[in-house]
């Protein structure tokens, strides 16, 4: 299984002017925790990291002490997550048939989650890790008035990894570029192209580090694991 990690974003909501994946969590950069879990996964054999050139040196410095037993390639990232994943798909080794895409900011994903997700591609063309929504969700208009309350039993919070057949995902990305679609995850491209996407149950602790509060929660979760 091949793994692509989008890592080209900035940490604006973290109040930082640098790539948030280079920030420290429990003594290591966020990206290091993601890589360590990927290294322990039995299914993953190759890792590609899409990043901006100004971060290449720091990312190499993160990779080196991990003593990676699997090939890790740094790939030029794009202006958006969507464009970064497109670049990553073009850089996959020849013969890659399936791929996992995992946000580097979800640095608490476990090796077991990677392995379960990899296995899911034996039964579908595309899937996302997700967990059932616990809170009641409200649809609100631009002025703050509630318009609707969707049935919570049908709502799931999307996570990563997300996994796909490489050929199909490339075709959907090309269609998205042709029609100028803008999406926030790769599953949305398959949906817009009319392909079904399956749910694989994710992990409650697989949160995305977006704000300083998320970082504090992640510190606590890691302290309980180590």
Curated annotation (Swiss-Prot):
One of its GO terms (biological process) is isopentenyl diphosphate biosynthetic process, methylerythritol 4-phosphate pathway. Keywords: Isoprene biosynthesis, Nucleotidyltransferase, Transferase. It catalyses: 2-C-methyl-D-erythritol 4-phosphate + CTP + H(+) = 4-CDP-2-C-methyl-D-erythritol + diphosphate. Its EC number is 2.7.7.60. The record marks 13, 20 as: Transition state stabilizer. It is an enzyme of class 2 (transferase). InterPro entries: IspD, IspD/TarI, IspD/TarI_cytidylyltransf_bact, ISPD_synthase_CS, Nucleotide-diphossugar_trans. Pathway: Isoprenoid biosynthesis; isopentenyl diphosphate biosynthesis via DXP pathway; isopentenyl diphosphate from 1-deoxy-D-xylulose 5-phosphate: step 2/6. It comes from the Bacteria. Gene3D superfamilies: Spore Coat Polysaccharide Biosynthesis Protein SpsA, Chain A (3.90.550.10). CDD domains: CDP-ME_synthetase. The record marks 152, 208 as: Positions MEP for the nucleophilic attack. GO terms for molecular function: 2-C-methyl-D-erythritol 4-phosphate cytidylyltransferase activity. Catalyzes the formation of 4-diphosphocytidyl-2-C-methyl-D-erythritol from CTP and 2-C-methyl-D-erythritol 4-phosphate (MEP). Belongs to the IspD/TarI cytidylyltransferase family. IspD subfamily. This is 2-C-methyl-D-erythritol 4-phosphate cytidylyltransferase. The lineage of its organism: Bacteria, Bacillati, Cyanobacteriota, Cyanophyceae, Oscillatoriophycideae.
């Amino acid at each position: 299984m091949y793994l692509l990690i989008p890592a080209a974003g900035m940490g604006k909501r973290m109040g930082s002017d640098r790539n948030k994946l280079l920030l420290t969590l429990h003594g290591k950069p966020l990206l290091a925790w993601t890589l360590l879990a990927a290294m322990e996964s039995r299914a993953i054999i190759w890792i590609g990291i899409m990043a901006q050139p100004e971060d290449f040196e720091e990312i190499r410095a993160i990779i080196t002490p991990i003593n990676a037993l699997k090939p890790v390639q740094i790939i030029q990232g794009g202006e958006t997550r969507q464009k970064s994943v497109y670049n990553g798909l073009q850089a996959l080794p020849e013969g890659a048939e399936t791929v996992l895409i995992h946000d580097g900011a979800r640095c608490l994903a476990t090796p077991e989650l990677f392995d379960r997700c990899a296995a899911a591609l034996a039964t579908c063309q595309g899937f996302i890790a997700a967990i059932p929504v616990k809170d009641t969700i409200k649809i609100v208009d631009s002025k703050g008035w509630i318009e609707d309350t969707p049935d919570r039993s049908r709502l799931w919070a999307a996570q990563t990894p997300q996994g796909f057949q490489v050929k199909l995902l490339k075709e959907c990305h090309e269609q998205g570029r042709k029609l100028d679609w803008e999406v926030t995850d790769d599953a949305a491209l398959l949906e817009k192209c009319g392909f079904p996407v399956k749910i694989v149950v994710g992990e409650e602790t697989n949160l995305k580090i977006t704000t300083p509060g998320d970082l504090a929660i992640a510190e606590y979760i890691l302290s309980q694991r180590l």
